[in-house]
Regions:
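Acidic, glycine-enriched catalytic cores built around paired aspartates
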Residues: 1-168
Length: 168
């Protein structure tokens, strides 16, 4: 619904003049006037936050067993208030994305591959399949405002990692 409303309410007259088919059809690109159609694109935000969260759960809940899933869930629900020791342990003792750690790199590959195949398996209301990407330039800040605490120790409301970069 959001995608359809976006195309109906926000035409791109200038961009449309640059694309094949809009003159001939007399339609804006958002009205289907272009000769070649791709997308729309779903741009992923927070991929390294996802990877680090999964790595934290795998490492601390399943491998080292130094945190129970119940305790982690409670800490997340409370934004780590009263769980600062756990938060510090998660942040400082979890293998993180971007550090050339094979098991984390494999996890990143598996998750991005899964997301890619899931996204392209769906068609938009305009017909073409969705395309995916991991290159948001600035959405990590506003998206972070609405994301709760994460298992690697990130507190609620703070910025997510930029694009597909590791946290810094």
């Amino acid at each position: 619904i959001n995608e359809k409303l976006y195309f109906e309410l926000t035409p791109f007259p200038f961009v449309s003049t640059l694309l094949d088919g809009t003159y001939e059809s007399g339609k804006d690109l958002t009205a289907g006037g272009v000769k070649y159609t791709i997308g729309p694109a779903l741009i992923g935000t927070g991929i390294s936050d996802l990877i680090d969260s999964l790595a934290a759960i795998k490492t601390h809940v399943f491998d080292e067993k130094n945190v129970t899933m119940e305790a982690l869930i409670k800490a997340l629900e409370n934004d780590f208030e009263g769980y600062e020791d756990m938060r510090q342990m998660l942040m400082n003792n979890t293998p993180m994305y971007g550090n050339d750690i094979p098991e984390v790199d494999i996890l990143a590959e598996e998750m991005t591959d899964f997301a890619y195949h899931e996204i392209i398996s769906h068609k938009s209301w305009r017909g073409p399949h969705y395309i995916s990407g991991l290159y948001p330039v600035s959405s990590h800040v506003p998206h972070g405002l609405v994301v709760g605490a994460l298992p690697y120790g990130r507190k609620a409301g703070t910025a997510l990692a930029d694009g597909c970069s590791p946290k810094g």
